[in-house]
């Protein structure tokens, strides 16, 4: 076993890997950006190294900085976690060619499976069903139209290196092809350094089923059952569970064995996930995630196997010490991603300070996180701040236990998806397990989400009170040895967050022109004002593209900018028509919430 492992990641997954290392007697090394110098993974590690500024491309994605940190720390292995460099075959090869051990599949296997067209061909050869489409990259929009001619609309354009919905664009008609083709290529280049895309028939109402795989360097391949990840918004998983409530025993066995065949054909080792779409009793290969998954936790809960420990053991050359028949699924488990997002605003990323952070406990409750009360949640990285994993003897017990746990979970200082999760636990389709990947985006009434937020959001989210609203403050007092909670209401008072934080200023939206301060050439600040209507950023992020120029006429609903926040593209649209009089941002600019992007006359 290794003596010291560098974890090339941040947040909860970095801490998860470090905990596994600690139980194996392995020392840990963290890397961090300027934005994460007080991060939970830095606090947990035995030692830590700064690898650059907040921008991921200059820190967590910088190959040489990560490897140099491993050299400074005298580590003997590098674990990538998930995201960032976890599925980057070029980085894996650099690690393999260095003095370090790569905790993951070989670079060759990653290349075979990381490029989706190669993976589709390989799976077809292994007698694993695939969705109809191309087995070569699409060179032009005409290739997309050709697939649509063969199979009909809608079709999906997917980035070769994509995953998690990034670089995936659904085309419903021919007039959408050109724009979506370019967007998919741009996202592929931005997120995965690979602008190649492929095309396949888009299934209308599938389940998203994935199989956890472990394979060692001695020829042993095991599957640990399936997970159901069908509850998604914008192709991003929200709640995952194991086992799936939608599979028959026959289909479950067929999918598991297909996953083993495909992985064996790819000469794959270490942990991985084979993802499938299931519709009308048939299953189709989608992709292989050549890394640990966010939702590996539910598999651990129902199998009793520590997937991360096995990653480390396999990388150290150990042999899997259990057979396929030894793998037994017991009970049921669900994972609730606790994202800093505003569900009522189409899950827009949120930022703020965790003025209160008090997670639940009790039997069947597991928390994977790397935050504590008082931490600042910025917009530089993914919006997930924690994972709540709830396990019970069956799905019904998990649903009841999850209601209790989410009711217990106390977070204040920023928006989270907890009200949405509580809504899902009352939702008939989810409780029955009949939902598909389209349920949130196409079926669920948005007004129900708004009502859930009104019902279950904290009463004092910092900066969210409008002037004149009633603010409730709760005090604990003791009278004759007995404790009482006393609530006082005051109209127009600012909310006072718990945890010693200072009162936040009102975030009410001003009317009329807004201002944006920019650095002038002389280094001072200049104030840019417009008499027209300002189009402002609703969140912190980076400008990926500006779709208009000064002098352009726009209509209500037209996209004027594309803003990336927490790894998601967000269209900034004009609320009314007009002529663009000023464009105040350019591609690559970082903006804060409220910054004016352009002015319409």
From Swiss-Prot:
It is an enzyme of class 6 (ligase). Mn(2+) 2 binds at residues 287, 289. InterPro entries: ATP-grasp, ATP_grasp_subdomain_1, BC-like_N, Biotin_BS, Biotin_carboxylase_complex, Biotin_carboxylation_dom, Biotin_COase_C, Biotin_lipoyl. Mg(2+) 2 binds at residues 287, 289. It catalyses: propanoyl-CoA + hydrogencarbonate + ATP = (S)-methylmalonyl-CoA + ADP + phosphate + H(+); N(6)-biotinyl-L-lysyl-[protein] + hydrogencarbonate + ATP = N(6)-carboxybiotinyl-L-lysyl-[protein] + ADP + phosphate + H(+). Its cofactor is Mg(2+); Mn(2+); biotin. It comes from the Archaea. Mn(2+) 1 binds at residues 275, 287. Mg(2+) 1 binds at residues 275, 287. Residues 526-601 form the Biotinyl-binding domain. Residues 120-316 form the ATP-grasp domain. It holds the Pfam family Biotin_lipoyl. ATP binds at residues 148-209. Consists of an N-terminal biotin carboxylation/carboxylase (BC) domain that catalyzes the transient carboxylation of the biotin covalently attached to the C-terminal biotinyl-binding/biotin carboxyl carrier (BCC) domain. The propionyl coenzyme A carboxylase (PCC) complex is composed of three subunits: PccA (biotin carboxylase and biotin-carboxyl carrier), PccB (carboxyltransferase) and PccX. This is Propionyl-CoA carboxylase, biotin carboxylase and biotin-carboxyl carrier subunit. The lineage of its organism: Archaea, Methanobacteriati, Methanobacteriota, Stenosarchaea group, Halobacteria.
């Amino acid at each position: 076993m290794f003596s010291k492992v560098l974890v090339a990641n941040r947040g909860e997954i970095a801490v998860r890997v470090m905990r596994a290392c600690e139980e194996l007697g392995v020392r840990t090394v963290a890397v961090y950006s300027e934005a994460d110098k007080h991060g939970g993974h830095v606090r947990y590690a035995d030692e830590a190294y700064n690898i650059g500024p907040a921008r991921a491309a200059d820190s967590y994605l910088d190959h040489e900085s990560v490897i140099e940190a491993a050299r400074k720390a005298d580590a003997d292995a590098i674990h990538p976690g998930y995201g960032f460099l976890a599925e980057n075959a070029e980085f894996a090869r650099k690690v393999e060619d260095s003095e370090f051990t790569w905790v993951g599949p070989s670079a060759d296997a990653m290349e075979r499976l990381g490029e989706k067209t190669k993976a589709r061909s390989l799976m077809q050869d292994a007698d694993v069903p695939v969705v109809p489409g191309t087995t070569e990259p699409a060179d032009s929009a005409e290739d997309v139209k050709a697939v649509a001619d063969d199979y009909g609309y809608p079709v999906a354009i997917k980035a070769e290196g994509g995953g998690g919905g990034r670089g995936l664009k659904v085309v419903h008609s021919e007039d959408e092809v050109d724009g979506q083709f370019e967007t998919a290529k741009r996202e592929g280049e931005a997120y995965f350094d690979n602008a190649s895309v492929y095309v396949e028939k888009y299934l209308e109402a599938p389940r998203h089923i994935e199989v956890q795989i472990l394979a060692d360097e001695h020829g042993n391949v095991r599957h640990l059952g399936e997970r159901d990840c069908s509850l998604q918004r914008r192709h991003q998983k929200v709640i995952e569970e194991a086992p799936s409530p939608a599979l028959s025993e026959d289909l479950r066995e067929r999918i598991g064995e297909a996953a083993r065949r495909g992985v064996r054909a790819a000469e794959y080792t270490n942990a991985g996930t084979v993802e499938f779409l299931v519709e009308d009793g048939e299953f189709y290969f989608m992709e292989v995630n050549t890394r640990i998954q966010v939702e590996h936790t539910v598999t651990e809960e129902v199998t009793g196997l520590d997937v991360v420990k096995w990653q480390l053991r396999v990388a150290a050359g150990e042999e899997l010490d259990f057979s396929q028949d030894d793998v037994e699924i017991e009970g049921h488990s669900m994972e609730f991603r606790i994202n800093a997002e505003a569900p009522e605003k189409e899950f827009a990323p949120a930022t703020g300070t965790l003025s209160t952070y008090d997670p639940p406990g009790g039997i069947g409750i597991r928390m994977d996180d790397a935050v504590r009360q008082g931490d600042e949640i910025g917009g530089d990285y993914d919006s997930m701040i924690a994972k709540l994993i709830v396990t019970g003897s069956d799905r019904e017990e998990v649903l009841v236990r999850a209601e209790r746990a989410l009711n217990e979970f106390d977070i204040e200082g920023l928006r989270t998806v907890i009200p949405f999760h509580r809504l899902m636990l009352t939702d008939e389709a989810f409780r029955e397990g009949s939902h598909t990947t389209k349920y949130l985006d196409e079926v669920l009434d948005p007004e129900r989400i708004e009502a859930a937020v009104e019902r279950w959001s904290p009463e004092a989210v910092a900066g969210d009170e409008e002037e004149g609203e009633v603010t409730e403050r709760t005090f604990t007092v003791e009278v004759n040895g007995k404790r009482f909670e006393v609530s006082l209401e005051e109209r127009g008072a600012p909310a006072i967050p718990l945890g010693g934080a200072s009162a936040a200023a009102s975030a009410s939206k001003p009317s009329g022109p807004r201002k944006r301060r920019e650095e002038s050439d002389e280094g001072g600040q200049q104030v840019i004002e417009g008499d027209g209507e300002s189009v402002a950023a609703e969140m912190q992020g980076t400008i990926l593209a500006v779709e208009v120029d000064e002098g352009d006429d726009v209509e209500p609903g037209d996209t004027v900018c594309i803003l990336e926040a927490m790894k998601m593209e967000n269209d900034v649209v004009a609320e009314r028509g007009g002529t663009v009089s000023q464009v105040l941002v350019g591609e690559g600019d970082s903006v804060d919430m409220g910054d004016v992007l352009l002015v319409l006359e």
